Structure formats: structure tokens, C-alpha cells
């Protein structure tokens, strides 16, 4: 599963941009991070949203994709993307919100997809941790959105919690759909199939937590050109949570440091490679 460049998934011969600005990793680097999965529309940010977002570029954050979960949050994601130059939007129905899918939802996604800064359909998928009794509804809503992704030629962002087998069945039924499994928690074997299909895997603060053994082992085997960094903020702040439970894009630095230690490379190279991967995945020049 290695892709060029020898060990550590091809990191050894990688390239780091020389850019001066904010102090990141103890060096003069700026605009190094791409947070490929955030939820800045969440009410946890209501008290300081604008101030926090305005602070991100100086903290090294170059790009953010804000992900929708239903009609309201998808529209909020678009609004954030149209307000902030470095924000983009993904739109769709999360499995927790599958029951709010209606006959107009597909047409809404088609209309949203026409907006310049909508780059993906997401966050979509299956979740059996809380909502297994709504399994059939989740299936129908995921299937509808995968069909839309193929129709609209947009990548998908998959939420997969305790539903690995069924999520993979949906992926196999749509070989022309490209996508990413965010907050990857599957096996190395599942990762290999996804990578063989051209998919990407997203990693966030959950990889720093106890019980993340499968994600760590998967990372060790992955080609570097399929790794995406994300926060899922305001959730899943990396450990140790010395500055509180609320997550934000500035904490990608700690995720990059953790991954670099696993792979035997530098945090700068992890961040820069993930930046290039994210731009390629979402089609952002």
C-alpha cells in the first residue's frame, strides 16, 4: 500500500513550502493547515464564532471545509463559505438527521451544488451507535445522496460509526463515486479496499485517544497522498485536553504532531502533504 518515496508512505522525499508568518511548530510558517471537516455553525461557537474564525489564518489555517448535517446546517455552511474567503462548504444529511430528509431534499442539494464554494456532499453515512433502529431510513438517505454525488460529480464525506460493513456495501454499489471516510475507524483491510478504489481517509483528534489502535495501524500502512487532516470541531479535541473540550482548527497542529511521531517524519511535512491532498480531493486550486 506504499506509493513511491520508500518507507513512511512516501514522506521521506516530500516537500515543505517555505513561507514566513505565524510561528507554527517553532518555525516561521503560515497558512499550513487544511481542516477538511469542521462544524463552525454549531451552537458551541455562538459566543465567539466571528472572532475565532478571524483568528484562524494567523494560527496557520489556510482552508476549512464546513460540513452540513441537514437543511439548516447546510445553508449555514454555505453562508460561512460565502463570508470567509478561506472557507468552503459541504452539504447533505447526516445519519442522525436522516428522518428529516424529505421529497425536496434532493432538489435542495442540486441547487446548493450550483454555488461556487460548495465542494462536496457531506456529512452523510450510517451511524449505528445511537440510531440503529432507523437503519432502513439511513440506508435510503445515504443511497439517495450517493446517487446525487454521481449525478453532480461531487465527492462525498462519509460518517461511519459502527457500520463498517454496510458503509462498504454502499461504496461498492457506487464505483464511480469518489469520497473520504472521515474520522476513520475501520480496519487496515477495509482501508486497503477504499484506497484501491481511490478513496481518502480523514484523521482527527480521535487518533490521540485510547482505543485508536486500528487507526494508528492503518496510518502506518497508508500512502501519504491519501491522508486528510480534520478536526470535526467543536468535537473530538485532541488529547491531552489542556485547553478545554471544545475543538477548533488551531488544534490541527497537535494532530499533525501526533501523526508525525507515528510515521517518523515531521509535523510540517504531514501538514503540507495533507494540504495538497485536500486541495486535490476537493478540487480547490
Predicted feature descriptions by range:
Residues 4-6, 11, 15, 19-285:
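Mid-domain alpha/beta scaffold segments of enzyme catalytic cores
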Amino acid at each position: 500500500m506504499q506509493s513511491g518515496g520508500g518507507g513512511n508512505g512516501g514522506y521521506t522525499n516530500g516537500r515543505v513550502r517555505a513561507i514566513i508568518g505565524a510561528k507554527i511548530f517553532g518555525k516561521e510558517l503560515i497558512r499550513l493547515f487544511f481542516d477538511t471537516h469542521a462544524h463552525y455553525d454549531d451552537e458551541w461557537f455562538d459566543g465567539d464564532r466571528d472572532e475565532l474564525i478571524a483568528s484562524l489564518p494567523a494560527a496557520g489555517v489556510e482552508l476549512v471545509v464546513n460540513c452540513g448535517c441537514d437543511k439548516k446546517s447546510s445553508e449555514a455552511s454555505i453562508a460561512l463559505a460565502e463570508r470567509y474567503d478561506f472557507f468552503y462548504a459541504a452539504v447533505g444529511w447526516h445519519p442522525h438527521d436522516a428522518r428529516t430528509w424529505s421529497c425536496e431534499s434532493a432538489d435542495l442539494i442540486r441547487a446548493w451544488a450550483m454555488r461556487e464554494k460548495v465542494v462536496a456532499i457531506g456529512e452523510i453515512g450510517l451511524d449505528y451507535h445511537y440510531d440503529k433502529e432507523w437503519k432502513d431510513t439511513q440506508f435510503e438517505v445515504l443511497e439517495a445522496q450517493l446517487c446525487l454525488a454521481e449525478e453532480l460529480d461531487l465527492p462525498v464525506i462519509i460518517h461511519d460509526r459502527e457500520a463498517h460493513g454496510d458503509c462498504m456495501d454502499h461504496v461498492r454499489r457506487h464505483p464511480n463515486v469518489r469520497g473520504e471516510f472521515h474520522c476513520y475507524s475501520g480496519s487496515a483491510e477495509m482501508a486497503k479496499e477504499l484506497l484501491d478504489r481511490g478513496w481518502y481517509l480523514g484523521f482527527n483528534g480521535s487518533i490521540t485517544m485510547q482505543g485508536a489502535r486500528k487507526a494508528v495501524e492503518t496510518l502506518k500502512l497508508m500512502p501519504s497522498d491519501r491522508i486528510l487532516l480534520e478536526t470535526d470541531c467543536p468535537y473530538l479535541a485532541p488529547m491531552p485536553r489542556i485547553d478545554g473540550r471544545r475543538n477548533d482548527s488551531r488544534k490541527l497542529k497537535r494532530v499533525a504532531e501526533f501523526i508525525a511521531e507515528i510515521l517518523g517524519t515531521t509535523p510540517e511535512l504531514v501538514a503540507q502533504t495533507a494540504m495538497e491532498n485536500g486541495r486535490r480531493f476537493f478540487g480547490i486550486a
